[in-house]
Design a protein with these regions (language model features):
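Non-catalytic, compositionally simple segments
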Residues: 1-101, 110-112, 127-170
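Metal-dependent DNA phosphodiester-chemistry modules and their immediately adjacent helices/loops
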Residues: 2-34, 145-157, 201, 205-292
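Acidic, metal-ligating active-site segments
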Residues: 110-123, 272-276, 280-281
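Short, surface-exposed connector motifs at secondary-structure boundaries
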Residues: 178-186, 205-209
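Short glycine-rich phosphate-binding loop at a beta-alpha junction
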Residues: 182-193, 198-199
Length: 302
């Protein structure tokens, strides 16, 4: 009606929205998009929703779309580094023989391969042990391209290197088996796309491999859980530099209507494979520890 596509003189379209460049945290801006603010639109509710968007950047797009009628990109920078830094301390317990879940994200041509293990601790926090691999022959090239110190990280023990200029999957397989012998690994999530052979080999080695596709259905709930743990300080990672770099890189994409989110490799500025692996590990933990519905019995009278 507004654009003249449909002619209906009984219909008056009025669209109230905040200007695209307006400060979405300014209450005066809220009034421009909500002319009935304080009457049918509750001001305290909007304040609480705005505070949520400030604390959790992934919610900013939804707040601006739903309450300010702004057109925004569906992806947004995700994790705040001051929140992430709450997990920088050393691991408080001995992890040997401890129960954990893991996610494995295999590298494409330029990515890192990442295995991330998630350990639930007795105090309700979660320790993360990440492992990363790149090929040794192009490490200098990767440093120049990504502008991060891969060689230094390797010398410090934060990054594995495989021989050659592509990932050596035989070495990767040996490394993963050696890592997993130290713990009680309950599941390793792996997207079956382009990884079927290694997944079958690792399963043949006795590792508990599980298919974990990287769509909204699988990734949204654990992504939200990760965000919650980061904000609340429950995610402990020891300040691992590679994982921290990738946490700073990650952006999410969202189907705003349903409220689903997931990390987006396409929208992120640099590598995020460790975060994707961590989300998969959280997803397996959620599935394994979800309460089983109590069985109920119905009485049938004949």
């Amino acid at each position: 009606v507004r654009d003249g596509v449909i002619k209906d003189e009984t219909f008056l379209p009025l669209i109230f929205s905040a200007p695209p460049d307006a400060d979405w945290k300014d209450e005066a801006v809220w009034a421009r998009a909500n002319p009935n603010l304080g009457v049918s639109v509750n001001l305290e509710f909007l304040r609480s929703e705005c505070a949520r968007a400030v604390e959790m950047p992934a919610y900013e797009s939804a707040f601006r779309q739903l309450y300010l009628n702004q057109w925004v990109e569906v992806e947004t920078r995700w994790l705040r580094m001051d929140h992430w830094a709450q997990g920088n301390g050393a691991c408080p317990v001995d992890l040997a023989g401890r129960e954990c879940w893991a996610g494995l994200d295999l590298a494409t041509t330029f990515d890192t391969t990442a295995l991330v293990l998630l350990f639930p601790l007795d105090d309700g926090t979660f320790w993360v042990e990440p492992h990363f691999w790149i090929p040794s022959d192009n490490a200098h090239q990767r440093e120049r391209r990504d502008k991060v110190p891969y060689l230094t990280w390797h010398r410090q023990g934060h990054l594995h290197m495989t021989d050659g200029n592509v990932t050596d999957f035989d070495q990767l397989r040996r490394d993963i088996n050696n890592i997993c012998t130290k713990y009680r690994v309950r599941g390793i999530g792996l997207d079956p796309w382009n990884a079927a052979q290694l997944g079958q080999q690792l399963q043949g080695d006795g590792l508990p491999m599980q298919h974990f596709r990287q769509g909204y259905a699988s990734m949204s709930a654990p992504s939200k859980q990760l965000e919650n743990w980061v904000v609340s300080g429950k995610l402990l990672h020891g300040g691992h530099p590679v994982l921290g770099w990738q946490a700073a890189n990650v952006a999410i994409q969202s189907d705003s209507a349903a409220g689903n989110i997931k990390p987006s490799k396409a929208k992120s500025t640099e590598r995020i494979d460790g975060i994707v692996s961590l989300v998969m590990a959280i997803g397996l933990w959620q599935t394994a520890t979800a309460p089983t519905p109590e069985q109920t019995w119905d009485l049938t009278v004949i």
